[in-house]
Amino acid sequence: MSTESMIRDVELAEEALPRKTAGPQGSRRCWFLSLFSFLLVAGATTLFCLLHFGVIGPQREEFPKDPSLISPLAQAVRSSSRTPSDKPVVHVVANPQAEGQLQWLNRRANALLANGVELTDNQLVVPSEGLYLIYSQVLFKGQGCPSNHVLLTHTISRIAVSYQTKVNLLSAIKSPCQRETPEGAEAKPWYEPIYLGGVFQLEKGDRLSAEINLPDYLDFAESGQVYFGIIAL
């Protein structure tokens, strides 16, 4: 709102006030009203000028140029954001062309194999000791339910360097069928995902595998549905 508009509104407000007979109280009231109107217009004009010329307004946060004045935590956050991570990480995906088996590939879109992790004999080889997040997902698909009960399993196993024995780290079992599809009835499709994930202490040279029991039920219709990976913490 401009200053001229504010002055015009004040004048119209004064004209709208009822006229009273002149007297000591009426003169004093008119004097106070005029003084208030003047102060209101002057204050609004001053505020408008200060905002227009940028004298007041939102302040920008400024960081000190001297690094010693920045907190150690802030320095660590800023330096880590500029330094690439050297922690082992891998994300492999299933090969949709491998019929009857679950084969992992790292040379595919959205796959990753970095900082020492190896994919050997369909197993992930841990490059260094430490805590790791291990995860995997598979998606099963079928048409109708057969007479024999369908049990789907997904397991992540570890073969440690210290003892050459396969040990299950994570495992899950699901059954997509509650009852057999009646003869002559429509065989409806079903989908059953299984996700596994957990944090484990691993040693250098440990081998990890992600396996299933019924690979013929795997669904490769869309990418990113079947994967396996580890992330060093």
UniProtKB/Swiss-Prot annotation:
GO terms for molecular function: cytokine activity; tumor necrosis factor receptor binding. Homotrimer. Interacts with SPPL2B. A lipid is attached at residue 20 (N6-myristoyl lysine). Belongs to the tumor necrosis factor family. One of its GO terms (cellular component) is cell surface. The modification Phosphoserine is found at residue 2. The record marks 34-35, 39-40, 49-52, 76-77 as: Cleavage. GO terms for biological process: extrinsic apoptotic signaling pathway via death domain receptors; immune response; necroptotic signaling pathway; negative regulation of protein-containing complex disassembly; positive regulation of apoptotic process; positive regulation of canonical NF-kappaB signal transduction; positive regulation of extrinsic apoptotic signaling pathway; positive regulation of JUN kinase activity. It is found in: Cell membrane. This is Tumor necrosis factor. It is a single-pass type II membrane protein. It comes from the Eukaryota. The gene is TNF. Signal peptide: none annotated. Residues 1-35 are cytoplasmic.
